[in-house]
């Protein structure tokens, strides 16, 4: 990877792509630059192609539901692999293994289908070239604490104050518009970059920003730290 280009695909995402590019450039010792505007990700800028990426049924793989209308209600979920096809068109011919790594930041909820449990899961990062980073998926993908879910269920069952439960646990997980989102996205961007450099995005060390955190606590303690473990720090040093 000679260069990293960070694209703002959605102005509402609230991520400073210039700051993100600068972080990646410093961390990896490569040239990095931002591209703002995001026209390629808005429905009016995608020629209707964006709507064709929307998931109609979270319990079926995309190829079995292609062309079906999404069910009414709920948050729109988009297939990550289909979005990558759009991203490739936005990024241009330089988005190749021998060219620049293009990192696309969006606030769309992005997911991929998992054959292991036959359903879609929200993915904060879909590592490829281009790679996708989703702020919405960083909120809704990693699980919140068991205590939070228990208290939220109890509040619903009793007609209690769900807002009070949210407030009590606000520090434990990311929410939309969270000031900690920029740090989390930096960690996910490092995962995308590591995949481009080595073919492996994740780390088993739960203190490393490359850790594949399935819980919000791990996102905040590891991914958002921006810190590499000793092994990956050395690996980056040897690659750049």
Describe the residue ranges of each PLM region.
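Zn2+-dependent metallopeptidase catalytic core
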Residues: 13-34
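Short hydrophobic beta-strand segments
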Residues: 1-14, 103
């Amino acid at each position: 990877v000679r260069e990293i280009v960070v694209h703002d695909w959605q102005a509402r995402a609230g991520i400073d792509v210039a700051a993100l590019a600068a972080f990646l450039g410093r961390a990896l010792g490569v040239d990095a630059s931002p591209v703002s505007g995001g026209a390629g990700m808005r429905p009016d800028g995608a020629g209707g192609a964006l709507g064709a990426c929307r998931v109609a049924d979270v319990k079926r793989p995309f190829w079995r539901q292609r062309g079906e209308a999404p069910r009414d209600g709920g948050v729109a979920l988009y297939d990550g692999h289909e979005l990558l096809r759009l991203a490739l068109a936005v990024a241009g011919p330089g988005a190749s293994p021998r060219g620049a790594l293009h990192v696309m930041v969006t606030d769309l909820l992005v997911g991929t289908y998992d054959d292991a449990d036959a359903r879609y899961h929200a993915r904060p990062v879909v590592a490829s070239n281009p790679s996708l980073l989703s702020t919405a998926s960083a909120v809704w993908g990693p699980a919140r604490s068991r205590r939070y879910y228990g208290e939220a269920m109890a509040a619903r069952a009793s007609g209690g104050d769900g807002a009070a439960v949210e407030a009590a646990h606000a520090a434990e997980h990311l929410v939309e518009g969270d000031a900690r989102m920029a740090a989390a996205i930096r960690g996910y961007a490092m995962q995308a970059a590591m995949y481009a450099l080595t073919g492996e995005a994740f780390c088993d060390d739960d203190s490393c920003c490359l850790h594949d955190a399935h819980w919000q606590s791990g996102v905040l303690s590891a991914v958002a730290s921006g810190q590499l473990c000793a092994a990956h720090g050395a690996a980056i040093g040897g690659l750049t």
